[in-house]
């Protein structure tokens, strides 16, 4: 029997997915259905770009609904109660310094569905997060990244 993939995420990440799902079901889906109905009224569907566009959007919306439903069904909410306060784990903000003397950087490790590196949120599946998870403040860690490796010192965990 195939093992189902779990989707680790923060409670905030789950709430955002639930909100997106509600928006897709209650707003976007009806809008697309209405666009299809209007486009059909134009007649010949074989050369109807509005109809094709609306059908493409419908496929996207339905695909995203299905994707979110699966993620929520197999969501695993991260709970750090049993993790030491100075240990790197999901849902925590980590500040580290690339050695020997780079400027400190801070990221929060989140589930794949929540990752947004430009907002300081990296996926638990990223090489950086995988290298940091489980280590503690003060540890120096060598992390394998796509173009080699880097050595970092963990400065803080919040």
Curated annotation (Swiss-Prot):
GO terms for molecular function: DNA binding; RNA polymerase binding. It holds the Pfam family GreA_GreB. PROSITE patterns: GREAB_1, GREAB_2. It comes from the Bacteria. Residues 102-125 are annotated as: Disordered. Keywords: Coiled coil, DNA-binding, Transcription, Transcription regulation. GO terms for biological process: DNA-templated transcription elongation; regulation of DNA-templated transcription elongation. Residues 49-69 form a coiled coil. Belongs to the GreA/GreB family. Necessary for efficient RNA polymerase transcription elongation past template-encoded arresting sites. The arresting sites in DNA have the property of trapping a certain fraction of elongating RNA polymerases that pass through, resulting in locked ternary complexes. Cleavage of the nascent transcript by cleavage factors such as GreA or GreB allows the resumption of elongation from the new 3'terminus. GreA releases sequences of 2 to 3 nucleotides. This is Transcription elongation factor GreA. The gene is greA.
């Amino acid at each position: 029997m195939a093992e189902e993939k779990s989707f680790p995420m923060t409670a905030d990440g789950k709430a955002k997915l639930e909100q997106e799902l509600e928006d897709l079901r209650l707003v976007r889906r009806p809008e697309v259905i209405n666009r299809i109905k209007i486009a059909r009224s134009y007649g010949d569907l074989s050369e109807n770009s509005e109809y094709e566009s609306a059908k493409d959007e419908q496929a996207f919306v339905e695909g995203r609904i299905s994707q979110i439903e699966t993620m929520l069904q197999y969501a695993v909410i991260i709970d750090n109660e049993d993790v030491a306060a100075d240990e790197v784990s999901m849902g925590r903000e980590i500040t580290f310094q690339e050695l020997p003397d780079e400027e400190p950087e801070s990221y929060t490790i989140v589930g794949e569905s929540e990752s947004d590196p430009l907002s300081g949120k990296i996926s638990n599946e990223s090489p950086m997060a995988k290298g940091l998870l489980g280590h503690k403040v003060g540890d120096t860690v060598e992390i394998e990244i796509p173009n080699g490796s880097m050595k970092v010192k963990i400065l803080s965990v919040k």
